[in-house]
Swiss-Prot record:
Mode of membrane association: Multi-pass membrane protein
A Pfam family annotated for this UniProt entry: K_trans_C
Job description of the protein: Transport of potassium into the cell. Likely operates as a K(+):H(+) symporter.
Transmembrane segment boundaries: 37-57, 74-94, 125-145, 165-185, 191-211, 233-253, 268-288, 321-341, 369-389, 401-421, 429-449, 451-471
UniProt entry keywords in alphabetical sequence: Cell inner membrane, Cell membrane, Ion transport, Membrane, Potassium, Potassium transport, Symport, Transmembrane, Transmembrane helix, Transport
InterPro entries: K+_transporter, K_trans_C, K_trans_N, Kup
UniProt-annotated location(s): Cell inner membrane
Name under which the protein is recorded: Probable potassium transport system protein Kup
Catalytic activity: K(+)(in) + H(+)(in) = K(+)(out) + H(+)(out)
Primary localization class, coarse: membrane
Amino acid sequence: MTAESQRAAEGVATAIEAAAETGHHGHGPHGDGKLKLAVGAVGVVFGDIGTSPLYAFRETFAGHHPIEPDRLHIYGVLSLVFWSMMLVVTFKYVMTIMRADNKGEGGSLALLALISRSSEGKRWTWPIVLLGVFATALFYGDSMITPAMSVLSATEGLSYVDKGFEPYIVPIALGILIGLFAIQARGTAKVGALFGPIMLLYFLMLAGLGILHIGNNPWIIVETLNPVNALRFFYLDGFTAFIALGAVVLAVTGAEALYADMGHFGRGPIGLSWLSFVLPALMLNYMGQGAMVLAAEAGPRTELIADPFFQMMPQFLELPVVILALLATIIASQAVISGAFSLTQQAIQLGFMPRLRVEHTSASAAGQIYIPIVNWGLMVMVILLVLGFGSSSNLAAAYGIAVTGAMFIDTCLMSVVLFTLWKWPAWKALPVLAVFFIVDIAYFGANLIKVPDGGWVPLVIGLTIFTLLTTWSRGRKLMQEEMAEGAMPIPIFVKSAANSATRVPGTAVFMTSSSDGVPHALLHNLKHNKVLHERIILLTIKIADVPFVPESKLCQLEDLGQGFHRLVLNYGFMQPIDVPEALMRVTSCGGEFKMLETSFFLSRQTLIAAKKPGMPIWREKLFAWMLRNSESAMEYFRLPSNRVVELGSQVAI
């Protein structure tokens, strides 16, 4: 690892450590009962993994690296699919990683914040920090490929309804995807209630189609559940089995969504819906596809394996099945898009991204957000992927490497949790981690073969976003250090300026990222306007390393004397920030604000790239560009535009 990479990681680590200064709050799912939440989880959490039967089995035997659809390979692949689901989804995520929640929330950034708190700022954590940030970057690549892959795969089913649809598959898929992104600004609260019932019906359809064909070969259930078939596959045809892993992993893509969405439903309901409903439905369908192919003679097998999912359909059910599959892929895509919005908000709050415009699409649900630049950026990339690859089979080559990379990183992060947070002894932790690492490395290695066929796409996307995230975090740290160098201590300023400057009526709020030094905007205001307000509030927004901060810990107000006050507003990394609304509630800590008598003073920095140690010039220029294009503090903190005064300053890093 280069020295520059280490400095970047330390910048990220510092950002997390800075975020880990305020209170803790448990946030868990609430509802009428575990069963209701489990049904809701089916509609949100399992969309990605639920649409895998459309292409996973097919890609093993008819993808870019096809294998012969004989009895050894079919039983071996089915056994690999089942035991992959048991080891990766059930054992790794449901039983282990989902126990490592950050006050009820999951996901790579939540886990990273949890680790930062447990390590208490130790510098040995910088490689783990880098891995966590890279997992976040890989998610964006996955959130571009998933909608393209899933919607294309379902749209291709229209050609089984009527061959006349074949030339229009790509245009229809593009129309659906563009429409999906276009409605994001309106929110999905109204149609979201339909997601659960639709996905329940979809999984029942998967199970029904599977049972229809398993009836011809019931013994396939025993063969699938028998791990000996997977081991025999590797023993008799090891290289082919390794190649097959690259496609088998498509059956578990979306496993990380169980952890990421844990805050909405809870570990118990997600585990219940997985083990009692989703897993059986998926496996029945995979076994049905295998039974159908095995029942055919050698010649027809080649035709069936070209698209086994849609070949399972009875003719009279073709259109309903295709429509239901299409709805399921739209719901899966929606979940990924919403996940990208949520992850972006967390990244902004934790200091990994510049301020971006965040719109709240629901008055009742704080989690319903819309980020325009993320939405349109994803849409452009999804369109390019659909046009560039042209079919779900081609896209499958690009799919998997980002997911397996993220799964490997989750295991790395989990190893830190086991040893430093849970204090597991080596004899207990090492066998668990050994299983996780062996499975993850095998899948990641098998997917590396796909790099020339399209696997490079998510890697390039991930590396690009990783560069942006670490550049912003490092640049922000350098800028804050530069501004803090010449900052005057607040007590000295209060004593020297309070009596000498002319005081005018009203309240002035000066926003500052540091609660120690005098804000630059205050110094500039005094220098140019020669006055101070009767009441001066030095306001700092602090983001905790927990998702939600309770009302009782919203603020701390300190009287500094001479009409000066220090006010700290505390937020969790998943809470929306609304400064005027918060100021109306600070009466709980002894303050009272009249908005019509309050002015907000902000400092807007202009960055000058200089040949100083810290970052290469190209990264300084990249950081300066990100700073210029970030959302203004006035809009991000929802300050009233007619009460805001902006004062500029130049900073060289």
